[in-house]
């Protein structure tokens, strides 16, 4: 295994195969063989050239499940053959954010698969401190711990509790994860999405009500679902500026809006509504180890399942040839996982 295959985004809309030297782990690192990898919205935006924190060329892939094949000389607590998932955020642990426990928004953060090469390749060497043991989980579930952790962080930021009225806008992977986790917290959850296909997915896989925000009676239906009130908490997972600008109109007085979806541009929020309601507005970025640990526990307990978001699987060996058609142009894709043994 002196060389390996890697899938590289050479430039926007140009994904190519390359052969690279297999990395060697530094003393505190572990060499992992990729088993499964999730395809993230970040990867899709990077392919299209509209990911704001990106440079080319780049090996994508930050949602990873892998097997350990070699450990560095200083690594303790992990062994060859162990199955692991990756926490892809490399934080400095020195800045004010890190020192206050917010390693997820480190001032100098580097994300594997975004700011440096990731796991759309056979092997990857990563810090042992960024691994989670996942021997009890199926590989496709373990690969999806990362997007579920982003959802979990947004729910934790909002302090969602038993009985809260929560509206999740956007039934993509992060929105689906947020809805599932908020419901596990005991909240009354409604999901809004303009896609009928995604609303059906919400109903079938999460067992939650799903509304079309474009319907003329959307707000009236929302109030009916929430006993005459608007949402106490709104989690926006769309990254759509129109939806994000309108979010404050869908919360009750004293309500909270959490932006977990990212928009590359400015937003215009109706200040009169924002102030009148004494609204709380917050962003949610990435996740911390606490969120990863919680998702792993929820998966082990059956509270979270891969099929809550996963609806397509791809073979790594043919991904470059089919990426545009099967991923970029697939209107029914919610979440895809790459299988490396196919």
Regions found by a protein language model. Give the residues of each.
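Glycine-rich phosphate-binding loop and adjacent beta-alpha segment
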Residues: 241-303, 337-342
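Glycine-rich beta-strand-centered segment in the early N-terminal region that forms part
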Residues: 21-37, 50-96, 135-137
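Mid-domain Rossmann-like dinucleotide-binding core that forms the NAD(H)/NADP(H) cofactor-binding site
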Residues: 137-215
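N-terminal Rossmann-like NAD(P) cofactor-binding module of classical short-chain dehydrogenase/reductase
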Residues: 85, 232-235
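Short amphipathic alpha-helix with an adjacent loop that forms part of the alpha/beta core around
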Residues: 217-228
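C-terminal hydrophobic helical "lid"/dimerization subdomain
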Residues: 1-4, 245, 289-342
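NAD(P)H dinucleotide-binding glycine-rich loop of Rossmann-like/cofactor-binding domains
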Residues: 90-169, 307
């Amino acid at each position: 295994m002196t060389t390996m295959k890697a899938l590289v985004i050479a430039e926007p809309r140009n994904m190519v195969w390359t052969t690279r030297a297999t990395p060697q782990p530094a003393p505190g690192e572990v060499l992992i063989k990729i088993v499964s990898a999730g395809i993230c919205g970040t990867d899709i935006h990077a392919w299209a050239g509209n990911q704001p924190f990106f440079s080319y060329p780049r090996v994508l892939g930050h949602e990873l499940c892998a097997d350990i094949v070699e450990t560095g000389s200083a690594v303790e607590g992990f062994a060859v053959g162990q199955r692991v998932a990756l926490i892809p955020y490399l934080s400095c642990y020195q800045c004010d954010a890190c020192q206050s426990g917010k390693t997820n928004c480190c001032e100098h953060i580097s994300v594997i698969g975004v700011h440096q090469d990731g796991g759309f390749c056979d092997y990857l060497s990563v810090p042992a401190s960024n691994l989670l043991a996942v021997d009890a989980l199926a590989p496709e579930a373990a690969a999806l711990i990362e997007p579920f952790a982003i959802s979990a962080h947004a729910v934790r930021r909002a302090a969602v509790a038993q009985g809260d009225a929560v509206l999740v806008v956007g039934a993509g992977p992060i929105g689906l994860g947020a809805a599932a986790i908020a419901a596990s917290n005991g909240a009354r959850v409604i999901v809004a999405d303009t896609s009928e296909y995604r609303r059906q997915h919400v109903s079938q896989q999460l067992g939650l009500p799903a509304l079309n925000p474009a319907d003329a009676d959307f707000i009236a239906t929302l109030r009916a679902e929430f006993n005459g009130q608007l949402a106490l908490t709104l989690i926006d997972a769309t990254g759509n500026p129109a939806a994000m600008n309108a979010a404050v109109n869908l919360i009750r007085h004293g309500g909270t809006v959490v932006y977990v979806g990212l928009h590359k541009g400015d937003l215009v929020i109706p200040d009169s509504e924002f102030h009148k309601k004494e609204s709380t507005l917050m962003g949610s970025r990435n996740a911390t180890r606490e969120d990863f640990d919680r998702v792993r526990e929820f998966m082990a307990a059956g509270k979270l399942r891969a099929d809550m978001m996963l609806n397509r699987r791809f073979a790594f060996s043919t991904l470059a040839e089919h990426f545009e058609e099967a991923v970029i142009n697939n209107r029914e894709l919610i979440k895809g996982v790459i299988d490396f043994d196919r």
